[in-house]
A protein has these predicted regions:
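Conserved catalytic palm subdomain of right-hand nucleotidyl-transferase polymerases, strongest
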Residues: 1-2, 69-77, 116, 126-136, ...
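Short, conserved micro-motifs composed of acidic
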Residues: 39-44, 49, 338-367
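Inter-domain linker/hinge segments that demarcate the starts of reverse transcriptase
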Residues: 53, 57-64, 92-102, 116, ...
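Conserved polymerase palm-domain catalytic core
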Residues: 201-304, 312-315, 319, 346, ...
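Basic, alpha-helical interaction scaffolds
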Residues: 357-406
Length: 406
């Protein structure tokens, strides 16, 4: 493992490095200088009383949905364990769930721990940041969050803008790709200078501000009981990072959402939808200039933390967009790393390109551009550009054929 220019080999040193990294990430409270007046965004308030109803048969129904042998958390219990022993453990589990519903979180921390297992993002990863953290959550906490996720899933479609497709039933990643593809082709056909800004959000799930999350939930109409349960689950959570199969020192969470928790993705997109509302509102009141004389449904595309924004390449729009991103980052903890972002010019002249390079400290790229795993282009793809996709599908065919064999 590398720490700067130093190579460390002892388990104790690597464990200390991993602990420091994640303690500064999830074990440090989010500092907030500003927040957002959500009332100014004009988002509706929903009737969500049904989410606060007592838990009943849905507990057992959720257990029946649990994968039987999925990797367990620190307690070692799998879905199969719950199903096999339900007649024995039913009363205790139902009592524990009822305690949570009533706002009694005493000793919940014992049932809300997790292991983080590190999955390499690339070949020969040598730094902690080059590993993706996946949480293996305690079975009880995972059961409760799955129950809450099942309740919320049916309401997300009406609560989250249509340009966010992640984690919502009957929405697909292709929707976002096609929306951006059609918009960039249309803008190119208009022969007017425009840009597509593709953002990199830093450590998205790990840095969500709990205070901002609760502000968003209350503004949407979530009741006090639901918000209290979310508070209890967040504040009682702890994590140990697995290194060579050995759990490290425990980290008490102070911010962020677990990757591997069934409810976390849904809470995350509710937070991200505020960014969409900010850009939409700025467009409606004329702070951002229109992209075309013809109406374009969305100037921003969101797929989880994947953000793409269409703008006019002028100083006012670019500076305002950076200010909106900065405000959202300060309020929510989700900061755009502009240096790691990309900007793609559409029909831009030399003076436009010079202005873009002066105001946006990010790499400027050309189409075709890989977006959500597919080549985004303003022209018909050549055979050479399509070939990598064909090769990738060909590599998958043997596995697909094996799945069809009985």
């Amino acid at each position: 493992m590398h720490v700067g220019d130093q190579v460390i080999t002892k388990h104790e040193d690597k464990a200390a490095t991993v602990l420091d990294f994640y303690d500064s990430l999830i074990g440090t409270e989010c500092a907030r200088g500003r927040t957002i007046n959500l009332d100014t965004l004009g988002s509706p308030v929903f009737d969500l009383e049904a989410l606060d109803l007592p838990f009943s048969e849905e507990v057992w129904n959720t257990i029946k949905e649990m994968p039987p042998d999925k990797a367990p958390g620190p307690d070692g219990f799998t879905g199969r364990s719950y199903k096999s022993c339900w007649t024995v453990i039913k009363n205790d589990v139902m009592a524990a769930v009822h305690f949570l519903w009533t706002g009694n979180f005493r000793n919940l921390q014992k049932l809300n721990s997790a292991y983080i297992t590190l999955i390499s993002k690339k070949t020969n990863a040598v730094q902690v940041k080059e590993y993706r953290p996946i949480s293996l959550v305690h079975s009880f906490a995972k059961l409760v969050t799955k129950i809450l996720a099942n309740r919320l899933a049916g309401r997300l479609d009406e609560m989250v803008s249509s340009n966010q497709s992640a984690f919502i039933k009957k929405r697909f990643i292709q929707d976002n790709f096609m929306m951006v593809q059609q918009t960039d082709k249309f803008l190119h056909s208009q022969k007017q200078p425009r840009i597509l800004l593709k953002l990199d959000i830093t450590k998205a799930f790990d840095l969500v501000s709990w205070a901002f999350l609760l502000e968003v939930l209350r503004k949407l109409g979530f009741g006090s009981r639901w918000c209290d349960m979310i508070c209890g689950l967040l504040s009682s959570s702890s994590t140990q990072v697995l290194l060579n199969g050995i759990p490290g020192e425990g980290i008490l969470h102070r911010r962020g959402l677990r990757q591997g928790d069934p409810l976390s993705p849904m809470l995350f997109i509710l937070v991200m939808d505020v960014l969409n509302q900010m850009f939409t509102r700025a467009s409606e009141v004329g702070l951002l200039q229109p992209l075309s004389s013809r109406p374009i449904q969305h100037r921003i595309s969101l797929y989880a933390d994947d953000v793409a924004i269409f703008l006019q390449p002028n100083a006012a729009d670019i500076n305002l967009s950076l200010q909106l991103l900065d405000l959202f980052g300060e309020a929510s903890g989700l900061r755009a790393n502009v240096q790691k972002s990309n900007v793609l010019p559409i029909h831009c002249a030399e003076e436009n390109l010079a202005l873009i390079q002066n105001l946006l400290p990010c790499e400027m790229l050309d189409f075709p551009y890989k977006y959500l795993g597919l080549p985004l282009t303003i022209k018909k793809l050549t055979k050479e550009q399509v070939q990598p996709i064909i090769d990738r599908i060909a590599d998958q065919l043997p596995g697909w054929k094996a799945d069809l064999m009985t």
